[in-house]
Structure formats: structure tokens, C-alpha cells
Swiss-Prot record:
Signal peptide: 1-16
Described function: Possible role in the secretion of LytB and LytC.
Protein localization: Cell membrane
Annotated gene: lytA
Protein name: Membrane-bound protein LytA
Organism expressing this protein natively: Bacillus subtilis (strain 168)
Length: 102
């Protein structure tokens, strides 16, 4: 009987050491895989939540977040900038960072 209880205890102990590999809600599958950095020319605000930057002679619209909105006041149309953005699952370009190009 003692061996049976010891065996049962050992099995329970090992089952508690298992690893749960389920993805938690909101966790990215591949972080930073869709983030790009490019240089371009700042055009300006397209609307209250979008800026336009010309990259490789093509206009690019980027959705801005509350964090990136505060930085936009220091840029004028025609400024050379370096943008870091992420392309989400819907194909939208989300601005992560904008800086003056050197």
C-alpha cells in the first residue's frame, strides 16, 4: 500500500511539472517581424490619425498612435525623416517612431 501511495504521489508530482504551451490571448506570434525602417520626406497630416510621408517617390500613409502624435509638432512639410512602422494583419501601416534624418 505504501508503494502504491508513493507511486501515486510521484505521478502527481511529475504531472505538475508539465509545460503549458498554449498561446495566451493578445500574445503576438512573431513580434517585430513586420517592423520596417525607411527614410523619406514628411508631407504632413492627412487627417487626425494619419500622416503622409513620401518614400522612394511614393506617398505612404501611416496611422499614428497617441504616443507618436506628440512628436509630430516638430516636423514641417518637406523635412527629411526616418520612420519606423509596423504592417498589421489588415495591411495598415502603424507608425512606431519618426525622427529627423541625418
Amino acid at each position: 500500500m505504501k508503494k502504491f501511495i508513493a507511486l501515486l504521489f510521484f505521478i502527481l508530482l511529475l504531472s505538475g511539472c508539465g509545460v503549458n504551451s498554449q498561446k495566451s490571448q493578445g500574445e503576438d506570434v512573431s513580434p517585430d517581424s513586420n517592423i520596417e525602417t525607411k527614410e523619406g520626406t514628411y508631407v504632413g497630416l492627412a487627417d487626425t490619425h494619419t500622416i503622409e510621408v513620401t518614400v522612394d517617390n511614393e506617398p505612404v500613409s501611416l496611422d499614428i498612435t497617441e504616443e507618436s502624435t506628440s512628436d509630430l509638432d516638430k516636423f514641417n512639410s518637406g523635412d527629411k525623416v526616418t520612420i519606423t512602422y509596423e504592417k498589421n494583419d489588415e495591411g495598415q501601416l502603424l507608425l512606431k517612431d519618426i525622427e529627423r534624418a541625418n
